[in-house]
């Protein structure tokens, strides 16, 4: 048996408030434009910035809609997000593996202001557009 996120526990994970909103970011590939990977239907650098207020709590759902049947390690710079375990506990991570055809919800408490990248850690996907800028206002 392979351990999953629901098997992990954080010793000192802070309680998270209710989210102010939910964002679904589909993971996909735009075959009409060639080898272009997308996040939320948009490819970097022409993708819209995701704008958050400092201390805003949002749910982000990474929805792997790629037809290529591959996993995507989604990574956020500068902040941590929470992944819920089966028992209701949470673990804080900066990267989550989103398997083929899986929707993976995470909860982000935007505590660290700045402009941060959210991207696939498969470098060739990131370099082909699977990246967004996340701005947390001070």
Feature locations, PLM:
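Extended terminal and domain-junction accessory segments
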Residues: 1-69, 109-115, 122-138
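Histidine-centered divalent metal-coordination motifs
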Residues: 72-79, 119-125
């Amino acid at each position: 048996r392979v351990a999953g996120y629901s098997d992990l526990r954080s010793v000192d994970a802070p309680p998270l408030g209710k989210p102010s909103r939910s964002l679904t970011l589909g993971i996909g590939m735009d075959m009409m434009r060639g080898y272009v990977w997308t996040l939320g239907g948009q490819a970097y650098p022409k993708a819209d910035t995701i704008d958050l207020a400092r201390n805003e709590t949002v749910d982000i759902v990474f929805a792997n809609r790629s037809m290529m049947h591959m996993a995507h390690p989604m990574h956020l710079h500068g902040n941590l997000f929470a992944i819920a375990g089966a028992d209701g506990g949470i673990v804080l991570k900066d990267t989550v593996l989103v398997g083929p055809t899986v929707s993976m919800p995470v909860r982000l408490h935007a505590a660290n202001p700045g402009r941060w990248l959210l991207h696939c850690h498969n470098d060739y996907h990131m370099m082909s557009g699977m990246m967004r800028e996340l701005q947390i206002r001070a």
